[in-house]
């Protein structure tokens, strides 16, 4: 443990106490510090986290405009590593600077799509988890993270679109696409979609066919119940780890299934790309509290009654 502490102290001094270091050396030292903490699974105490967050923020305020694309991405990645699973509130100070870095990255048409997506997910998560005011944070994320990322995808022509149209000669096929199928904890989206599936089963219609596409982790105890619904077809894409491969697989399956209406519920970069790919002729965003996605590929919003007034105040649903 003493060796770990000594190494950590050495890396800290290299990052923040070397007066002769330029911004490139400081950036590299921050990256090495974050890698060391992550690889050794070190849990930093709150006073240390507060010092680190303040030092990184000071560095970005002074030198953020000097960083190149690789360095901006490395800093975002380093903060994500230091942030870890404890989600200490001391990192909130970094939100404005990380948003600046992300918007700068998203404005670069030559930025690799994987880097843009990773940076989007990391900055989004930090902003969301550090919120104080739900309404203001939602608006901040929509305008400064979601929309720049959506515009970036438009500029790089990320549009492997499906061109199917709703057929009048078959059942209407509705697909719920969910990242984490769970009803445990505070994950409202999973509970909402689970309730909708139950409703479809109990009110079985000969004119509607229901699909459930699961793209991430699944609460195993839910599957036997959902699989017993004779009018719900489940497709699990969890084992496709590569995001590009998963998108292509989902796109092909949706086209083969002839999905008419796609309903999704999350803001992950992958979900934005699913919508951008136009997996169905009609696409909807199901909101369990977050303000509506204002991207052209979302045709309708499904909002709970108690959320409608709040959402309308931010962005009027079409």
Predicted regions: what they are:
Residues 1-223, 228-230:
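N-terminal subdomain of nucleotide-sugar transferases
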Residues 225-230, 274-281:
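Short, surface-exposed basic-aromatic patches at helix termini and helix-loop junctions that form
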Residues 249-252, 270-276, 297:
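A short acidic, amphipathic alpha-helical/loop segment
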Residues 254-268:
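Short N-terminal targeting/anchoring amphipathic segment
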């Amino acid at each position: 443990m003493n060796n770990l502490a000594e190494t950590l102290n050495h890396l800290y001094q290299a990052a923040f106490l070397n007066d002769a270091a330029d911004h490139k050396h400081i950036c590299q030292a921050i990256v090495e510090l974050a890698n060391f903490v992550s690889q050794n699974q070190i849990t930093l105490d709150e006073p240390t986290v507060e010092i680190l967050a303040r030092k990184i923020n000071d560095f970005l305020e002074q030198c953020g405009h000097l960083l190149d694309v690789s360095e901006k991405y490395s800093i975002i990645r380093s903060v994500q590593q230091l942030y870890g699973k404890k989600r200490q509130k001391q990192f909130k100070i970094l939100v404005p600077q990380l948003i600046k870095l992300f918007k700068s990255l998203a404005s670069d048409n030559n930025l690799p799509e994987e880097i843009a997506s990773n940076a989007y997910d990391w900055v989004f998560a930090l902003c969301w988890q550090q919120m104080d005011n739900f309404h203001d944070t939602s608006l901040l994320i929509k305008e400064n993270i979601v929309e720049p990322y959506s515009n970036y995808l438009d500029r790089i022509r990320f549009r492997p679109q499906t061109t199917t149209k709703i057929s009048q000669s078959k059942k209407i096929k509705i697909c719920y696409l969910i990242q984490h199928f769970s009803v445990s904890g505070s994950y409202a989206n999973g509970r909402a979609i689970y309730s909708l599936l139950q409703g479809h089963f109990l009110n079985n219609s000969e004119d509607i066919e229901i699909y459930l596409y699961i793209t991430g982790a699944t609460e195993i105890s839910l599957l036997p119940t959902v699989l017993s619904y004779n009018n719900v077809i489940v497709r699990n894409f969890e084992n496709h780890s590569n995001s590009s491969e998963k998108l292509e697989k989902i796109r092909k399956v949706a086209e083969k299934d002839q999905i008419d209406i796609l309903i999704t519920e999350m803001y992950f970069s992958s979900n934005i790309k699913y919508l951008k790919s136009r997996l169905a002729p009609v696409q909807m965003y199901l909101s369990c509290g977050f303000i509506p996605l204002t991207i052209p590929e979302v045709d309708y919003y499904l909002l709970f009654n108690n959320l409608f007034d709040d959402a309308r105040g931010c962005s009027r649903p079409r």
